[in-house]
Amino acid sequence: MANIRIGHGYDVHAFKAGGHVVLGGVRIPHAKAFAAHSDGDVLIHALCDALLGAAALGDIGRHFPDTDPAYKGADSRVLLRRVVELLHEQGYRVGNVDATIIAQAPKMAPHIEAMRANLADDLGVALECVNVKATTTERLGFAGREEGIAAHAVALIESF
C-alpha cells in the first residue's frame, strides 16, 4: 500500500507600486506589484510549503531563503520544480493539489486555467489533479483593502 500524506501551505505578500502580479506563473496586469524577494508568487509559495510539509521537509524559507541573493527576483516556477525534485528524491510523487487565492483585485477568473496548466506542468501531473480557485474577503482585512494577496494550498503526495 502506498504511503499517502497531506500538507498545507499559506503565503501572503503585500503590494508595492508596480504594473503586474505573478500568480501560478501567470503575469497578471495590475496597478500594484508584490513586495517580495522573489517574484512574490503567493500561490506557488503556498503550494511549495504544502508539498514540503507533506514530505516533512520543512518549508520554502528553509530551502530558498530570502536572505540568499541567488533567489532575488527568482521565478517561483523554478522553485516549485525543485520542490518536486526533492519529493522524488524522497520517494514521493504528487497526487493532487487544491489552492485558494484570497484577493479583492485583480480578478482571477480569466487566469485560473492558465495557472492550472502551469502548475500541472511543473508538478508533472494531469490537469484534473490541480484545482485553483479564488475568493474575496468582501472588502474585509488587508486583502479587502487591497494591501496584498494571500493563498492557501493543500497537497496530497504518495510514495512510489
From Swiss-Prot:
Cofactor remark: Binds 1 divalent metal cation per subunit.
Family annotation (InterPro entries): MECDP_synthase (IPR003526), MECDP_synthase_CS (IPR020555), MECDP_synthase_sf (IPR036571)
Lineage top rank: taxon: Bacteria
Gene3D superfamilies per record: 2-C-methyl-D-erythritol 2,4-cyclodiphosphate synthase (3.30.1330.50)
EC class name: lyase
Pfam annotation, one family: YgbB
GO molecular function: 2-C-methyl-D-erythritol 2,4-cyclodiphosphate synthase activity; metal ion binding
Phosphoprotein recorded as keyword: no
Pathway: Isoprenoid biosynthesis; isopentenyl diphosphate biosynthesis via DXP pathway; isopentenyl diphosphate from 1-deoxy-D-xylulose 5-phosphate: step 4/6
Presence of the UniProt keyword Acetylation in the record: no
Cofactor section: a divalent metal cation
Primary role: Involved in the biosynthesis of isopentenyl diphosphate (IPP) and dimethylallyl diphosphate (DMAPP), two major building blocks of isoprenoid compounds. Catalyzes the conversion of 4-diphosphocytidyl-2-C-methyl-D-erythritol 2-phosphate (CDP-ME2P) to 2-C-methyl-D-erythritol 2,4-cyclodiphosphate (ME-CPP) with a corresponding release of cytidine 5-monophosphate (CMP).
PANTHER family: 2-C-METHYL-D-ERYTHRITOL 2,4-CYCLODIPHOSPHATE SYNTHASE, CHLOROPLASTIC (PTHR43181:SF1)
Site feature: Transition state stabilizer: 37, 136
Amino acids binding a divalent metal cation: 11, 13, 45
NCBIfam families in alphabetical order: ispF
Keywords: Isoprene biosynthesis, Lyase, Metal-binding
EC number, as in UniProt: 4.6.1.12
Gene Ontology annotations of biological process type: isopentenyl diphosphate biosynthetic process, methylerythritol 4-phosphate pathway; terpenoid biosynthetic process
Family: Belongs to the IspF family.
UniProt subunit comment: Homotrimer.
Name used for this protein in its record: 2-C-methyl-D-erythritol 2,4-cyclodiphosphate synthase
Organism: Thioalkalivibrio sulfidiphilus (strain HL-EbGR7)
